[in-house]
Amino acid sequence: MSDQAPKVPEEMFREVKYYAVGDIDPQVIQLLKAGKAKEVSYNALASHIISEDGDNPEVGEAREVFDLPVVKPSWVILSVQCGTLLPVNGFSPESCQIFFGITACLSQVSSEDRSALWALVTFYGGDCQLTLNKKCTHLIVPEPKGEKYECALKRASIKIVTPDWVLDCVSEKTKKDEAFYHPRLIIYEEEEEEEEEEEEVENEEQDSQNEGSTDEKSSPASSQEGSPSGDQQFSPKSNTEKSKGELMFDDSSDSSPEKQERNLNWTPAEVPQLAAAKRRLPQGKEPGLINLCANVPPVPGNILPPEVRGNLMAAGQNLQSSERSEMIATWSPAVRTLRNITNNADIQQMNRPSNVAHILQTLSAPTKNLEQQVNHSQQGHTNANAVLFSQVKVTPETHMLQQQQQAQQQQQQHPVLHLQPQQIMQLQQQQQQQISQQPYPQQPPHPFSQQQQQQQQAHPHQFSQQQLQFPQQQLHPPQQLHRPQQQLQPFQQQHALQQQFHQLQQHQLQQQQLAQLQQQHSLLQQQQQQQIQQQQLQRMHQQQQQQQMQSQTAPHLSQTSQALQHQVPPQQPPQQQQQQQPPPSPQQHQLFGHDPAVEIPEEGFLLGCVFAIADYPEQMSDKQLLATWKRIIQAHGGTVDPTFTSRCTHLLCESQVSSAYAQAIRERKRCVTAHWLNTVLKKKKMVPPHRALHFPVAFPPGGKPCSQHIISVTGFVDSDRDDLKLMAYLAGAKYTGYLCRSNTVLICKEPTGLKYEKAKEWRIPCVNAQWLGDILLGNFEALRQIQYSRYTAFSLQDPFAPTQHLVLNLLDAWRVPLKVSAELLMSIRLPPKLKQNEVANVQPSSKRARIEDVPPPTKKLTPELTPFVLFTGFEPVQVQQYIKKLYILGGEVAESAQKCTHLIASKVTRTVKFLTAISVVKHIVTPEWLEECFRCQKFIDEQNYILRDAEAEVLFSFSLEESLKRAHVSPLFKAKYFYITPGICPSLSTMKAIVECAGGKVLSKQPSFRKLMEHKQNSSLSEIILISCENDLHLCREYFARGIDVHNAEFVLTGVLTQTLDYESYKFN
């Protein structure tokens, strides 16, 4: 840093809570404090981890357990210099980055290219400089000449590469072998000096594509094969020339390696061993491709080389807006932990034969109609059932571009696709005849055949349009699929032989797929016949209901546009609907709350609602809560009956398994949950249920269909995250705020983020929220259908919306609006308004007294005599009055429990303040002490005002006076270490505060068995105590297996209250 620290914009780091790991430059800390950043004492509480050492265990814990961004101190310095918080992505200190440990010197490149290379190297963990010195590990130079080049040749420690090395490392996300990128391997053509001949040169270069190579990159492979000049890509002159003739390219026929750089979104997943072949393979002939559009983050300014940038602009017109937003989001400060996000399919492709991997990728995005065949074959033949098959999201804007790319790849990869249009149509007709004539297979059904049927049904249009979409992707650009014949080099001939072998394998695979498709079709036909019969019965029932509804609601049909509509997926054509929908799908019906013709006041939005409550009274330990519900319902115009009767309009219940629920459904009453009631209270309007949590669950209260699952969540915040926690609890699953290898499911809002990356790496299934909602509503098949594409689609408009066929019977009662009589409306309309005015008049007097209004203290005491006081167990208004009196007497409110001398409480409560203060305060007194001090205008002796709570002391079997005496003699947890698992309740920060006030220390890293035994056997080392909870027991499996005690939170909570160590009462068995 410079001697004079830069000026920090006011409150620049106001939202930053940082935790420093290792030695950090004091000036960096000063900059953070000057920008109003807050330092926290535990990494779980931080928003940013700052460290130079990426291999520190605390850094790994912050990344993997707490999902926190880790940045180098340079992030602080550069953010100050730029005047804004920079994205954290490019400042990771971790050693897994591509260019970690590399210091590159840039020479003989244009300023524009230098900026691009500099940004790429530093973004991926390296350093750049313009001076060639001892620190340099690499010299990046486009031509084998110059002083720096000659100097670097004499030093074995410096590796000399062309700029292509940087680009290839980034695009393939791995550090490439520098030996193949030495600039002396470039072969040059004679440069034309006359400007008049530029056009002729361009034509010659274009013609050379037909004779030899289209590879412009200055790689050894291209130079050995007689490619054009290697410095064209980084020469400003040649860039200008080339942009005229070559930027207009056709993706469907361009198989050159430049396409890989132009789009920056394709990179090989499986590469041949021969480096030369690898460098020269045309794009469309790569054995396996992974979409990595989000992997190469854009960097500020004109970072990409001119040619790449120009081609990106040409190709970018066809890119979907969502891909652009993903790339922009990589630099957005709001995206905390976006690293190299891979396509949903990359883990699937790791251990597959190359032909299967390629089929998976090439068919995943545009050819959704083939997903069932491919997925079926993968699950049957490649053990892919342990991972997810997820489609790439395709928007109409990119569909044409991707079709062209896929058509070319399919032309080269699939022999069955390498046919003329007439042959394809004939082949399809034969397939259709074979399928229609195929009898029901005699062999046992494939274990995933049922899955495939449901998958087909879950995607309308998909099965019926296969025969239409299949040829379109071949025939769309037929004239563009055949480029002029290129000259085959020796290694290309070898590759051609390999490709023929791949084609034979693929042909066999496609035959297997056809056989499986026939099997699926026959099973599908049987299911369709059953569905048609069910639909006919359903329609008859619906017609009767419609007639009843029309007779009841005819006067109000003109005003139905004001009513709430429940969103139902768009209707399919009748023929498709019969063949595809898994359950009978009725016509779209409008859902009503109140009669839309009647205006219901907000304060009485439950007018006309008569509630009965089932299930909840048995579940509630606090009966006062039930009384509160009844009071709130009545305050908003509703009534509550003690039992379910025919006059009830709503049944508030948790489960569909009860006699009250069965009766309510028979009588077409509205069955909803307390969560629905909470939602309508917020909206001040009775709306139909529209979330899975609004409907009673399909199993008895306390049923646990997901008892074997440990669920984590990513992408959901605030109320959505709370809803998922509740859904996991109702399903009987364990919920963890962190992600570890023991988690069985990750529920994602979007396929992004560190948790998503880790889940893919650890083979943890990633699903949408609909998966959990379906289980709650009775689709228990979802437990084994976790890999279905319907649960791995993350572009849902509302992921919490219920699946329609699971709630048809529950929505039936909402198709008839609730009527409110005019008399009831008039009798209720006025009183609530009067009450509202009364409340408005009273409200100002009940506001809190502000601290600013407190008069200055009349007495000034020395620090030794000044009481530092905390209050617990009082209403806020009462606390403000006490604080006023305390200030007048010259006392202070303690900043924390550690600095507290007096705790004022009216009874023993297990609040954080009480449990932290009991270990450190001198006195715990009643409010009467403060009142008496104020009356005497001085602080008096506390002995006569010591808190005594006989009821609590009997309940917890302790004496508060004795506990205080023990705490004064010696801290309870002195010389004791605690490891507390992250999902503990109360929170980890609360437990840490309680332990530290009692003299203990909390370990940030989970101790190994060896470390535990070392501390246990060596009396000179501190004891380590393990604290966990039910949801975190999977983290303690090793401890249980080796007979090590693990305690629950009461070991700490009750321990500090009684000031005793009880090693027996709170152990997990």
From Swiss-Prot:
It comes from the Eukaryota. It holds the Pfam family BRCT_2. Residues 219-230, 428-440, 448-494, 543-552, 565-580 have a biased composition (Low complexity). Residues 94-183 are annotated as: Interaction with PAGR1. Keywords: Chromosome, DNA damage, DNA recombination, DNA repair, Nucleus, Phosphoprotein, Repeat, Transcription, Transcription regulation. Residues 8-93, 94-183, 601-694, 703-779, 866-947, 970-1059 form the BRCT domain. Residues 188-208 have a biased composition (Acidic residues). Its main location: nucleus. Residues 590-1069 are annotated as: Interaction with TP53BP1. Changing residue 910 to Q: Abolishes interaction with TP53BP1; impairs intact cellular response to DNA damage. Residues 553-564 have a biased composition (Polar residues). The modification Phosphoserine is found at residues 227, 235. Gene3D superfamilies: BRCT domain. A motif (Nuclear localization signal) lies at residues 702-719. It is found in: Nucleus matrix; Chromosome. CDD domains: BRCT_PAXIP1_rpt1, BRCT_PAXIP1_rpt2, BRCT_PAXIP1_rpt3, BRCT_PAXIP1_rpt4, BRCT_PAXIP1_rpt5, BRCT_PAXIP1_rpt6. The BRCT 1 and 2 domains mediate the interaction with PAGR1A. Interacts with the C-terminal transactivation domain of PAX2. Forms a constitutive complex with PAGR1 independently of the MLL2/MLL3 complex. Interacts with TP53BP1 (when phosphorylated at the N-terminus by ATM). Interacts with HLTF. Component of the KMT2 family MLL2/MLL3 complex (also named ASCOM complex), at least composed of the HMTs KMT2D and/or KMT2C, the common subunits ASH2L, RBBP5, WDR5 and DPY30, and the complex type-specific subunits PAXIP1/PTIP, PAGR1, NCOA6 and KDM6A; required for the association of PAGR1 with the MLL2/MLL3 complex. This is PAX-interacting protein 1. It comes from Homo sapiens. The lineage of its organism: Eukaryota, Metazoa, Chordata, Craniata, Vertebrata.
